[in-house]
Design a protein with these regions (language model features):
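Secretory/periplasmic and organellar redox-cofactor proteins
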Residues: 1-211
């Protein structure tokens, strides 16, 4: 009697399958949105450099003000305008998404590289969020678009890699991941809610003047 072998751990369950189907589209479309936002931000940055009196199109009021953010040291965290990093990163993300949609099955090292890149993006975005809320005191609408796509890209890439066994994990970690996969959209909603509360709290004095 032939023993039945345990199936390899992959995203074949209903929840894992959803992650696997969503990720390529998220990379392609979310990356494209991020690329457009980063490009628009770079254009505004160049206009500000050419004309210090230029008012960016994304400067709406004292709080929603790209002009304020673009002229801070944080806007060039690594010695070059942050949008350049965004253009490079999102170009890679879009390419990966298109490759996956075409049916390619990249090797593990490829996925680990994507994981490292999205992790860097997520950490950098949260540093920028902190700087915007508590140091600069202004929000850049184009930057917020980048925030809104970077975190989901990191989140779904991480869930997919853990589910597929590409990242080191223990049985306990995998059980936790199974729960997170089941509530993948809920986690993102909680993150968005927490960010909304933080923004409301940071600029509460200004918001109340609009009532």
């Amino acid at each position: 009697m032939t023993p039945i072998e345990a199936p390899e751990r992959t995203s074949t369950g209903p929840d894992g399958a959803i992650i696997g189907r969503v990720l390529p589209w998220l990379l392609a479309l979310g990356g494209a949105v991020g690329l457009v936002a980063a490009t628009a931000l770079l254009v505004e940055k160049l206009k500000v450099l050419a004309d210090p009196d230029h008012v960016p199109a994304c400067s709406i009021d004292p709080v929603l003000s790209c002009g304020t953010v673009l002229t801070t040291p944080q806007a060039e965290a690594f010695g070059i305008p942050n949008p350049i990093l965004g253009i490079i990163g999102f170009s890679v993300v879009v390419t990966v998404g298109v490759v996956l949609l075409a049916g390619a099955r990249p090797p593990r090292w490829f996925w680990l590289g994507l994981q490292a890149g999205t992790l860097f993006g997520a950490v950098f975005v949260h540093w920028l969020i902190f700087q915007s809320l508590y140091r600069i005191g202004a929000l850049c609408p184009y930057c917020m678009v980048v925030w809104a796509v970077t975190v989901p890209i990191f989140w779904y890439t991480t869930l997919h890699n853990v589910r597929e066994g590409r990242l080191p994990s223990t049985p306990g970690v995998r059980r936790i991941t199974d729960v997170l996969v089941r509530y993948h959209s809920t986690v993102l909603c909680l993150w968005a809610a927490a960010l909304t509360v933080a923004i409301a709290q940071a600029f509460w004095t200004y918001w109340t003047t609009l009532i």
